[in-house]
Amino acid sequence: MTEDNHVLVKVEDLKMHFPIYRGVIQRQVGAVRAVDGVSFEIHKGETLGLVGESGCGKSTTGRTILQLYKPTAGKIFYEDTELTTLRPEKMRQMRKNIQMIFQDPYASLNPRMTIRDIIAEPLVAFGSATGKAIDERVRDLMKLVKLDPDFMLRYPHEFSGGQRQRIGIARAMANNPTFVVCDEPISALDVSIQAQVINLFEDLQKELDLTYLFIAHDLSMVRHISDRVAVMYLGIIVELADRNEIYANP
């Protein structure tokens, strides 16, 4: 739940257009306006739910906030830092604070890496820990997401979908981020597992003081976890309100 009115993430008139090329010389003949002028704020400690039908641009919005896509136009702020103007090295350092949890737990984990190496990857990349400290941190992270640390030398194929998603969550938490984009993190899971993962997200938010952008199409789950909900349609936000208000007066 939101702690105060402190704005952690601010998005101003965000646009992400993908060019369409045709012909032998690949001339641009148009563009797909995946995100077409989106603006919103996310307060510290809050969960903002972002919902909409497939293809409406919600996942593109999340990926563009993290600069996985370079926006066509608009501004994105984390605290007082404008992400859209950061140089690559500065943006790389910023990724300690902002992380993403992907939709597909089967595709987002390298099948050739052990769970230990997968979770430790951000620690190694940023030099956050070395030697035995890495193993200790991995064990702590596995406990945090309710996985047995004794399984750290196993491979992704030895785990269920729900367990794989927990591994992805542990990896995202490795460098103690403050803002996490959750890109439909439960849509690929069995219904029986979805509630457990949602509860884990809520527990982590309370324990680690996290702020979420929670992208989903399951309205009941979004209502359960979100403080406010934004509804997206054809690249724009058509409604943004408190979760109870938006469900009472859709």
Model-derived regions: residue spans:
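ABC ATPase NBD coupling module
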Residues: 24-29, 70, 83-99, 117, ...
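P-loop NTP-binding/switch modules centered on Walker-like glycine-rich loops
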Residues: 185, 189, 193-250
